[in-house]
Amino acid sequence: MSPRHVPATVHELSRVTLLAGLPGETIAALARRMTREDVAAGSAVVAEGDEGDRFYVVLSGILTASQATLGPRGVLRPGDYFGEVAPAMGVPRTATVRAMTPATVASCDRETFDEIVRPLFAD
């Protein structure tokens, strides 16, 4: 996975259902603080059991989530998000997310997650 120090765009983030209702200035601030990363097919974005301090949204490609004991847990497509449990609860990653195709994700750090994203889960 190679981070490109290019922020996500407001347009990209507005396609994420969780984020779509954010006010324009808030989604713009979030976009500036997210880092875009290209992921090769077959590569893991996060690994179950690892420390997790980033929240991710899928911008392109198809990824799968799986757990060692339960197997496949789902497919992630553009507009989906993952990685919220670890930073929200301070626990290790609960699943491995791997790219099935070349993919692009954008992620933010725990501070940004706590400030902008976490309140969206309170509803």
Sequence positions of predicted segments:
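Cytosolic regulatory regions built on CNB/CRP/Popeye-like sensor folds
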Residues: 1-123
